[in-house]
Amino acid sequence: MGLSRYLSRRHHWVIQYCALLLFLYFIYSYVAVSNDAPRLNEEIPVFREFSEDLPQGSRKFPEQKPAAALGDEALDPFEKYRGHEKIKWEDEVAYEKDKAREGPGEWGKPVKLPDDKETEKEALSLYKANGYNAYISDMISLNRSIKDIRHKECKKMTYSAKLPTVSVIFPFHEEHNSTLLRSVYSVINRSPPELLKEIILVDDFSEKPALRQPLEDFLKKNKIDHIVKILRTKKREGLIRGRQLGAQEATGEILIFLDAHSECNYNWLPPLLDPIADDYRTVVCPFVDVIDCETYEIRPQDEGARGSFDWAFNYKRLPLTKKDRENPTKPFDSPVMAGGYFAISAKWFWELGGYDEGLDIWGGEQYELSFKVWQCHGKMVDAPCSRVAHIYRCKYAPFKNAGMGDFVSRNYKRVAEVWMDEYKETLYKHRPGIGNADAGDLKLMKGIREKLQCKSFDWFMKEIAFDQDKYYPAIEPKASAEGEIRHVASNLCIDTQFKEQNQRFGLRKCASEDKDGGGEQDLRLTRWHDIRPKGRKICFDVSTSVDKAPIILFDCHSMKGNQLFKYRMPQKQIYHPVSGQCLTADENGKGFLHMKKCDSSSKLQQWAWQTIDQELLDQRQANEHKELE
């Protein structure tokens, strides 16, 4: 006789319901992916479906539309987001609430350390461990307010009333706890809740105790563990695979990758999503601003530039086109992303093969993804109304060597061999170490390029990076002036002494008179009107117009501005148009060089180049004058 006969109909239903729950729990427990067992690309349904018939060898595919072999109706997964009214997504309530906040670092203002030796000692220890002032970070609220540094017209912008959901992915390794959590809270506080599906923290084998159980306890205590997930690796994977692992676990329609020392500005999300909703093969990058590594002050980096590279594979920037400058709130095409900050539809990411899994730790991933986005019929834009601030580490390199040899050259070789066609030889000529590296097995990535019927790198250079050669040519143009720069008053020469970025420099005895003196005095006035040591891409740079403004060395960007100098022949002055000042040294030649108001009668501002091509100098400076007009 069955038990059911002794139960009421209601009790019978309850038992059936409980049994169903137990069954579902068993199924979930069986199939759930462990945070400690990240999947391979082949286990991602979209990637598996797309890659199962990747071509082998020279197998050819029939003529297809630009969206080559991407599936049937799934070619347009975001059609449901089109045709809706455009609305303002500004969160005025949150904005007004932030206005009332007070405390250290609020509104992105700088914070200073307390003036006592014990604090300085502790702060230095944290500085060395992180590469930024983590002591200051601990003084600032995790929910701090920030200054709205967007263009004023951004607050008037409207976007589709219906937008895709997102997974925000933060890979990190030994990140300082409060800096990591502030990154998380900036996303939660400034994202529409209906769009933010999850935040995935990818812990790349961190050893700091605070990043283990205390971090998980914090998320639970503050009731954000339902949206913030932690994925932990079992060994050091590196930044590239960390992002990949996060993408593999993501469930949002759009993936957004951010560094774990970031703070998002107001209404940062809709400007990233709207272009992707219009075309799922569009990748969108925010403007990246600066969080000062010393004070945590948030300030704008600039008002935009197009990403690019030089032929040593250093990331560089190209100026905006006239059309882009006239539309300061409109997304603009950019050949190459900076790397750490971008949004991409999950479908497009996996159709492109995700990140090349042969890339180790970091380096080259921004080129690999940028080239294949453009060459494989997608596009990439920067969105001026989406702004995210980033800490650029300074002074200390806190992480251990990966112990993998020259992985950067190997990464670059993989990118060049798959995507750059005959242009790779120019790269190898400038960086022989890349050409000599072992790229490993490239069959999968070359197969993806073939299946997507991607365009040539020659097309990319001529249509997308069309002005690349003007600013970063494969063959360096002749200098307008070169050699020693002799200071008339002291009879000493400018010597940059092989110093690095952000360092100041001064005068030393001229090398032509002191063959054993060493130093770095062979300088060039280039076609971009910047001054740089021979063979190096580091330039004289002046960033302020105050009296006795310092002149430092900074990575050459070939975009003039702070690095634009003119040589005034009759007065022998080195003039800096942006500050309106002239290069000056003390009479005895001691101390660092600086800028002062121009005085044509002062010998302290007179400089003699060793060699000048007068005709070329006049021609270039005349052209520069026309451009400025």
From Swiss-Prot:
Segments passing through the bilayer: 13-33
Cofactor: Mn(2+)
EC numbers for this chain: 2.4.1.41
Domain Ricin B-type lectin, residue spans: 526-629
GO CC, alphabetical: Golgi apparatus; Golgi membrane
List of residues binding Mn(2+): 259, 261, 390
Associated pathway: Protein modification; protein glycosylation
Glycosylation sites: 143, 177
Region (Flexible loop): 393-406
GO biological process entries: protein O-linked glycosylation
Transmembrane helix listed as a keyword: yes
Region (Catalytic subdomain A): 163-275
Function: May catalyze the initial reaction in O-linked oligosaccharide biosynthesis, the transfer of an N-acetyl-D-galactosamine residue to a serine or threonine residue on the protein receptor.
Family designation: Belongs to the glycosyltransferase 2 family. GalNAc-T subfamily.
Protein name: Putative polypeptide N-acetylgalactosaminyltransferase 10
Gene source species: Caenorhabditis briggsae
Gene label: gly-10
